[in-house]
Amino acid sequence: MKILVYPHDLGIGGSQINAIELAGAVHRMGHETIVFGRPGPLVEKVRVLGLEFVAAPTTGRRPSMAAARALASLAQHRRIDILHGYEWPPSLECYWAARRRPQVAAVSTVMSMAVAPFIPKHLPLTVGTYQIAEVEAGVGRSAVTVLEPPVDVDANRPGLDLAQAELRRRWGIADSGFVVAVVSRLARELKLEGILSAMDAVASLPAGMRVCLLIAGDGPARAEVSGRAEQVNIRTGRQTVVLAGELADPRAAYDVADVCLGMGGSALRALAFGKPLVVQGEAGFWELLTPSSLGTFLWQGWYGVGSGQAGGASALRQILSEILPAERLRAELGAFGRSVVEHRYSLEHAAEVQLDIYAAALDPASSSRRAYFRELEAAGHFLRYKRRRLQARLTGRDTADDFNARPVATARPVQAFSAGGAA
């Protein structure tokens, strides 16, 4: 097959790293794979994996008919079989490019915590959690597949030479004491609350523990994060919080940590490095990954919703105060997390599932009449969405990561997902 993969951007972030690594795995299985997108730091990763990169046209608003036309032209001239968009703007652009070309199929992957209702319901959709898949099937999506965020377990593992000493030297991180690391985009939606409460939690730990919180990432909330870090460092009289910014290769940040905090793909990469993981969510949610909590995360994804922001810092403080001094417990939890990733989230398994999705998308058995009505339904959702966004901008309530701002996160029994499922 000839496949074009279109991440939503090429800045450092979980969804786009997953897209590129999975494209590389599919390429290694003998399929021609092109990465299309707006140039950014991850273009270098695309090239390291031996993939061709094609720059998308620069447009002000997304989705863009200019991008859709560029995709359609590329599909025609390169005889591409699959146009694969990650997140909703690329998904719509791929869909528009493919809809008048019966030999080309569009597919969509959404790794956000909720799916935009205006992605046409007959478009093959991949999501990252069983909970989201159930919600989407319940609203009539006909082709929903769960593909949990894959991890390259060879490129992300203990024992690699990742210039860890240089990272410590550059940011003044002492070999003594403990390092708690979070690798995250500094987004106001989904991420900011947890990052701020993590700083407060670490600042409240006993001074004798000498805990350093290493934050690797950048984004629109950098000013708020930087301001809080400065306050914490003044209050504690030392460099309690290190704000390292966006690292071209953040693997060293995972590796130097004694404990990692995170959600989604970042949480899984922390596990690949054999680190104890405290899963970050919203409304004060923090939970340590253990054999007993694994089932929850296999159902709802590596994320959660707590009972309120006010208790977040104290909840995390309690977890850290228990596991940081317990070296044996940390080793056991790290080994458990590594085994979960190896058995359930390997890149090779994900590539095989992805190829099955592509093959099904190319199957000519489809109903054009049903597709027509579902397009009308999707168009109605999109127009209502645009109207709400315009109203939000006018009232100052606009959000950049809009579908991460309304995540699917309902409570549900998880008896079907046990620690045994990791194997």
Language model regions located:
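A short, well-ordered alpha-helix in the C-terminal region of glycosyltransferases
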Residues: 329-344, 356
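Nucleotide-activated donor-binding/catalytic signature segment of Leloir-type glycosyltransferases, i.e.
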Residues: 226-247
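Donor nucleotide-sugar binding/catalytic pocket of nucleotide-sugar-dependent glycosyltransferases
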Residues: 115, 122-162
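A short helix/loop element that forms part of the nucleotide-sugar donor recognition site in Leloir-type
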Residues: 157-173
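Conserved donor-binding/catalytic core segment of Leloir-type glycosyltransferases
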Residues: 4, 151, 166, 174-192, ...
